[in-house]
C-alpha cells in the first residue's frame, strides 16, 4: 500500500470473497477503506459526516451544488456531462440524516478513473465560491419575472422537498425521527423543509462546505478489482496532500433516553373534496440501542420480520383483526447512530389511538412471556440468510451497497467499518441464541421496558395545503411590498440574470476538460441471449444457461391473452393474494414460514409485454428460487399456492384490499410520474390501457370501490378470483422459464409433471382479449404541492419507424433539452422520456412546480430536434452514455429474465444487434431526422397531469376532465 497512508487493520471478508483494509491518510487523517476482490464492477465513494443544525436543507443543497462545476472541471454541470458520456454503472449522490455520500461505479478502467477524478474535484474544489447562482438554481431563489408579477420561490431542492412533503408517509417518517431524537442533528430535516429552505443564506451555505468538506472529515472507499496503489497515490498527490489535518467537530452526543413516553400530534393535508374520516396515521416508535451493536443491528431486523413483516406475523395480525387502520406497517431504520423502530397504522380512525397502543403492548408482552414459536424464528432467519447470501441488489452494484452499509458503523467508529458486512459470524451467534430467549429479551428491553418511545398521531386536515400555499404567497407578497421600487427592479434583473446564466452553455474548452473514452473501448456485440427450448410433461421449457451458484430460478408463466377484460382486475388481485391467504394445508402464517424455510421466496405477479403496435401479451407468473436440493419442496409449495389457496375468506380479503388501497395511494403521491405517463399512453395504447387496469389509476379506482362497498362487492370478488384462476391455470397456457447452469431442466421433471396434474382442464379458448382505449386529456387533483406532467403518443400510428437512434435521442433529451428547460430553468426535480420500438412514447416531469410551462417545453421539442447541432466529440459522448445505460451489469436471474422477454417479444440477437449498431453509428443527421417522430408524439395531444388541485384548476383548459383522485 502507498506510504502516505498507515494501514490500521487488514482482515479477510469471506462474505465478499476479498480482503478489507482500514487505512488513515498520514497528513490529513482522512479515513480510507479498501475492499480488494475480483469484482470488475469497481466502486468509489467519498462521504462526509454532515450533521444539520437547522431545517434549511444545506447538506442536501450542497450535495446538488458541488456537482455544478469545480476547479479542474469548470463546466456548468460535470455530473450531466458524465452521465452523457460515461459507461458508469452507478453515478449519483445522496444526502442522509447525518452524512452526504458521493458514489460512482464502472467496469471500464479509464471510465472509472475519470469518474473518481471528477467527483474528488467536485467535493474539494467546487465552483460554489465564485458562482452564487449555483445556490439559487439548486437550492432556492426569489423568482420575479416582471415588476407587476407575483413574487415566488423556485429552486430544484425547494421543489423536490415540496414533493417529498406532499407524501403523508414521508411526512410521518420525519416527524417520528424528530420526536425521538429531537436534541440531536436527527431532530432537523437534512433534506430541507420547504418552509425553512428560504432561510438559507449564501454565507451559511459556504460555511457548511468549509466546515465539513475537508479530508479530515472524509470517509473514502475503494472496492473491486483495481490497482489500489495507483488510486491511493492519485488521491494523495492530486488532493489530500494539499490539506493539513484539521480538528472538525462533526460528532454529536446521543439523545438522552426519555423518562416517559411522549405523545406528538401533527396534521397533513387532504384535498378539499376528500373525507377526513379514517385517514389518521397512528404510530408507536422506539429507539433501539446503538448501531455499533452488530448483533442487535441484524437481530432486530429478524425480530421485526417475525413480529410484523412476515405473512401472518402475530402482532400485525392482532392489530388487523381489531380493524385498526387499513394497513399496519413497521419500519426499522438502522442506518443512523440510534436506530429507530416504528409500527404504523395507516388510515385509522382518530379514536383508535388508545386501542392501537393497548393491543400492541398486550401482544408484545404476551409473546415476550410465552416465547416466539421456533419455526417463526427459523423462517425469518432463512429469509435473511438467503437474502444476504444471494446479494442481488438489482441495478445497484454490490460494492456500492456494501459501501453504503459500511457507513452504518464506520461513521460512528473509525475502526468498525466491516461489522455489518461480516454477517456469517453474526448469523451463527444469533442462531445459537434462539433457545436462550435472546429475541424475547429484545422485546422486553426495547419495546416494553424502554421509555425512549413516542406515540405520533398524524391527522388529516382539509385545505391544509391551500393554507400553506397561501401563507407562502402572503409572506412573499409582504416581502415584495416592503421593497423599494429599486429593490423590486433589482429582483427582476436578478431573475433575468439567473435565466441568462442558465441559458449560457459551457465553452468547448471547459467541456473538453473531462476526458472521454474511445468508442473503440466499447463492446460492439450485444450480450448473448440464452433460450434453450425443451419440454417437460408436454409443456415448453426455456432454459437460460447462466451460472447461479447452486440456486435454481424457476418461473411458471401462463399466457392470459384469452382472459376477458372484465376478469383482468381479479387476475391482478389474485397475484396479490397468493402466498398471503390460507390454503388447504396451511394458515397463511404457516405457509409464509414454509416458503421462507424451504425456498428463497415464492411470488405471483402479472407481466404485460408490448409485442407490436397495438398488440401485447399479458402473463400471469408464479416464480420461486431455491437451492437445487430443495426443488421438490419448492414445487410442493407452488402447487399449494396455485391450487389450494382459499379465495373466499371474507375477513382476509378485506384486509388485503385495504392494504392494496393504501399502497396504491402512496404510489400515486410518491411516483406520480409513472401513473401520469401510463395514463396518458392508455388513451391510445392497448398495452398501456391493460397496465392501467392492473396497476394504474384505473386499478386504484377499482380497489377503492371494492373497499368502500366491500359487502356488496364480496361475491363478485370471490367469483372473479375463482373464474380468473380457472382460466389462467391451464396446461395450454403454460411455459416454464428456468435459469441455472449446474443442472439441466430434467432435474425437475417429476416435480413439473406433478404440478401439471393439478392444473385445470384445458378449455376451448375464446378470442383474444380486447382492450378499448378512450381518448381523453385528464387532470387529477391531489393535496400535493407539485405536479407530474405527462404527454404521450404513438409515432408508428403516424407511419414512422423505430430506430436505435431514438435511444440516443432519449439520452440527449434527458440530459440536455429537458434537463435544461424543465430542471435547470423550470426547477422540477426530474424529467424523462421514452420511445418504444412499438411506437408508444411519452414525456413526463417529476416533482414539477409548473404545468403549462412544461407542456410548452414538450411542444417545442420537435423544433429542438430539427435544429439539433453537436460536434463529433459531443456526439461520441451521447453514444457512450447511451451504451452505458444499455449495458448495466446484470445478475444471472436478470439475464434469464432478459432472455425470457426477448423470446416472447420475438426478438433475436440479430434484432438487438441491429439496434446496438444503430446507436454506435448514430450521427447528428440521424438525430435531426427524428424530428417528425417527436412531433407526432406531442401533436397526438394525449395529456395527463397529477398535481396540486389549485394548479390544475388554474390550467383546466389543458384537460377535457378534471378529477379528484385522492
Model-derived regions, located:
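Non-catalytic terminal extensions that flank enzyme cores
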Residues: 1-43
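His/Glu-based metal-binding/catalytic segments typifying zinc-dependent metallopeptidases
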Residues: 36-38, 45-47, 158, 162, ...
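M16 family metallopeptidases and their MPP-like homologs
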Residues: 41-51, 77-125, 132-143, 170-195, ...
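Non-catalytic, conformational "gating/processing" segments within enzyme and secreted inhibitor domains
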Residues: 154, 206-238, 691, 696, ...
Amino acid at each position: 500500500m502507498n506510504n502516505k497512508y498507515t494501514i490500521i487493520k487488514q482482515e479477510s471478508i469471506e462474505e465478499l470473497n476479498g480482503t478489507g483494509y482500514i487505512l488513515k491518510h498520514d497528513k490529513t487523517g482522512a479515513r480510507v477503506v479498501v475492499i480488494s476482490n475480483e469484482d470488475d464492477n469497481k466502486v468509489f465513494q467519498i462521504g462526509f459526516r454532515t450533521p444539520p443544525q437547522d431545517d434549511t436543507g444545506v447538506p442536501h443543497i450542497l450535495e446538488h451544488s458541488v456537482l455544478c462545476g469545480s476547479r479542474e472541471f469548470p463546466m456548468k454541470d460535470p455530473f450531466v456531462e458524465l452521465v452523457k458520456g460515461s459507461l458508469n454503472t452507478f453515478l449519483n449522490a445522496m444526502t442522509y440524516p447525518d452524512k452526504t455520500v458521493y458514489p460512482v461505479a464502472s467496469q471500464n478502467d479509464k471510465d472509472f478513473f475519470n469518474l473518481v477524478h471528477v467527483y474528488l474535484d467536485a467535493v474539494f474544489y467546487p465552483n460554489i465560491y465564485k458562482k452564487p447562482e449555483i445556490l439559487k438554481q439548486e437550492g432556492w431563489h426569489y423568482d420575479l419575472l416582471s415588476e407587476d408579477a407575483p413574487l415566488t420561490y423556485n429552486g430544484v431542492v425547494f421543489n423536490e422537498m415540496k414533493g417529498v412533503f406532499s407524501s403523508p408517509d414521508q411526512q410521518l417518517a420525519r416527524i417520528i425521527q424528530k420526536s425521538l431524537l429531537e436534541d440531536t442533528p436527527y431532530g432537523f430535516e437534512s433534506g430541507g423543509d420547504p418552509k425553512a429552505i428560504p432561510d438559507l443564506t449564501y454565507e451559511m451555505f459556504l460555511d457548511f462546505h468549509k466546515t465539513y468538506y475537508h479530508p479530515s472529515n472524509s470517509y473514502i472507499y475503494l472496492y473491486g478489482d483495481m490497482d489500489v496503489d495507483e488510486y491511493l497515490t492519485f488521491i494523495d498527490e492530486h488532493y489530500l496532500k494539499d490539506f493539513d489535518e484539521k480538528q472538525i467537530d462533526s460528532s454529536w452526543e446521543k439523545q438522552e433516553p426519555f423518562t416517559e413516553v411522549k405523545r406528538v400530534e401533527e396534521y397533513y393535508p387532504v384535498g378539499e373534496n376528500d373525507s377526513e374520516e379514517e385517514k389518521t396515521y397512528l404510530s408507536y416508535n422506539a429507539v433501539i440501542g446503538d448501531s455499533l451493536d452488530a448483533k442487535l443491528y441484524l437481530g432486530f431486523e429478524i425480530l421485526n420480520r417475525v413480529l410484523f413483516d412476515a405473512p401472518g406475523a402475530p402482532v400485525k395480525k392482532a392489530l388487523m383483526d381489531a380493524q385498526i387502520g387499513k394497513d399496519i406497517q413497521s419500519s426499522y431504520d438502522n442506518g443512523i447512530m440510534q436506530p429507530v423502530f416504528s409500527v404504523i397504522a395507516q388510515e385509522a380512525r382518530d379514536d383508535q389511538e388508545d386501542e392501537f397502543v393497548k393491543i400492541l403492548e398486550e401482544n408484545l408482552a404476551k409473546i415476550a412471556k410465552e416465547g416466539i414459536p421456533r419455526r417463526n424464528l427459523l423462517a425469518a432467519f432463512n429469509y435473511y440468510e438467503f437474502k444476504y447470501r444471494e446479494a442481488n441488489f438489482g441495478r445497484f452494484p454490490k460494492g456500492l451497497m456494501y459501501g453504503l452499509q459500511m457507513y452504518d458503523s464506520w461513521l460512528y467508529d473509525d475502526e468498525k467499518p466491516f461489522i455489518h458486512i461480516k454477517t456469517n459470524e453474526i448469523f451463527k451467534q444469533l442462531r445459537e441464541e434462539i433457545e436462550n430467549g435472546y429475541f424475547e429479551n429484545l422485546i422486553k428491553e426495547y419495546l416494553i421496558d424502554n421509555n425512549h418511545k413516542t406515540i405520533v398521531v398524524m391527522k388529516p386536515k382539509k385545505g391544509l395545503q391551500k393554507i400553506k400555499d397561501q401563507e407562502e404567497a402572503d409572506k412573499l407578497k409582504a416581502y415584495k411590498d416592503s421593497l423599494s421600487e429599486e429593490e423590486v427592479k433589482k429582483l427582476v434583473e436578478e431573475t433575468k440574470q439567473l435565466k441568462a446564466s442558465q441559458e449560457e452553455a459551457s465553452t468547448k474548452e471547459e467541456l473538453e476538460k473531462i476526458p472521454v473514452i474511445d468508442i473503440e473501448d466499447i463492446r460492439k456485440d450485444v450480450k448473448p441471449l440464452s433460450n434453450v427450448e425443451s419440454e417437460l410433461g408436454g409443456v415448453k421449457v426455456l432454459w437460460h444457461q447462466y451460472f447461479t451458484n447452486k440456486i435454481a430460478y424457476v418461473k411458471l408463466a401462463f399466457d392470459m391473452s384469452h382472459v376477458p377484460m372484465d376478469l383482468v382486475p381479479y387476475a391482478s388481485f389474485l397475484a396479490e393474494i397468493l402466498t398471503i391467504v390460507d390454503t388447504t394445508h396451511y394458515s397463511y402464517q404457516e405457509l409464509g414460514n414454509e416458503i421462507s424455510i424451504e425456498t428463497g421466496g415464492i411470488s405471483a405477479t402479472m407481466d404485460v409485454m408490448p409485442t407490436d403496435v397495438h398488440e401485447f401479451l399479458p402473463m400471469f407468473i408464479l416464480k420461486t428460487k431455491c437451492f437445487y436440493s430443495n426443488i421438490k419442496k419448492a414445487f410442493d409449495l407452488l402447487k399449494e399456492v396455485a391450487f389450494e389457496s382459499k379465495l373466499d375468506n371474507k375477513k382476509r380479503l378485506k384486509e388485503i384490499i385495504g392494504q392494496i388501497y393504501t399502497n396504491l395511494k402512496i404510489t400515486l403521491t410518491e411516483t406520480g410520474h409513472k401513473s401520469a405517463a401510463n395514463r396518458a399512453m392508455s388513451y391510445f395504447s392497448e398495452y398501456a390501457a391493460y397496465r392501467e387496469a392492473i396497476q394504474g389509476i384505473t386499478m386504484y379506482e377499482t380497489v377503492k370501490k371494492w373497499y368502500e362497498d366491500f359487502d356488496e362487492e364480496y361475491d363478485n370478488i370471490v367469483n372473479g378470483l375463482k373464474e380468473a384462476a380457472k382460466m389462467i391455470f391451464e396446461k395450454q397456457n403454460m411455459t416454464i422459464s428456468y435459469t441455472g447452469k449446474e443442472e439441466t431442466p430434467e432435474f425437475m421433471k417429476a416435480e413439473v409433471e406433478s404440478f401439471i396434474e393439478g392444473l385445470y382442464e384445458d378449455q376451448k379458448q375464446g378470442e383474444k382479449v380486447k382492450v378499448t382505449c378512450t381518448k381523453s386529456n385528464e387532470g387529477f387533483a391531489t393535496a400535493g404541492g407539485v405536479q407530474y406532467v405527462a404527454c404521450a403518443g404513438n409515432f408508428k400510428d403516424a407511419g414512422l419507424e423505430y430506430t436505435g437512434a431514438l435511444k440516443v435521442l432519449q439520452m440527449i433529451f434527458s440530459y440536455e433539452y429537458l434537463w435544461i428547460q424543465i430542471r435547470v430553468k423550470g426547477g422540477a426535480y426530474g424529467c424523462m422520456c421514452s420511445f418504444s420500438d412499438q411506437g408508444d412514447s411519452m414525456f413526463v416531469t417529476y416533482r414539477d412546480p409548473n404545468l403549462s410551462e412544461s407542456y410548452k417545453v414538450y411542444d417545442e421539442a420537435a423544433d429542438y430536434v430539427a435544429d439539433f447541432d453537436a460536434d463529433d466529440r459531443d456526439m461520441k459522448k451521447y453514444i457512450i452514455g447511451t451504451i452505458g445505460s444499455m449495458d448495466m451489469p446484470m445478475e444471472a436471474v436478470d439475464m434469464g429474465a432478459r432472455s425470457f422477454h426477448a423470446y416472447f417479444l420475438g426478438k433475436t440477437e440479430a434484432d438487438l444487434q441491429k439496434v446496438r449498431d444503430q446507436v454506435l453509428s448514430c450521427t447528428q443527421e440521424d438525430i435531426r431526422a427524428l424530428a417528425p417522430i417527436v412531433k407526432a408524439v406531442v401533436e397526438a395531444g394525449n395529456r395527463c397531469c397529477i398535481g396540486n388541485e389549485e394548479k390544475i384548476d388554474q390550467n383546466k383548459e389543458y384537460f377535457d376532465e378534471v378529477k379528484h383522485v385522492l
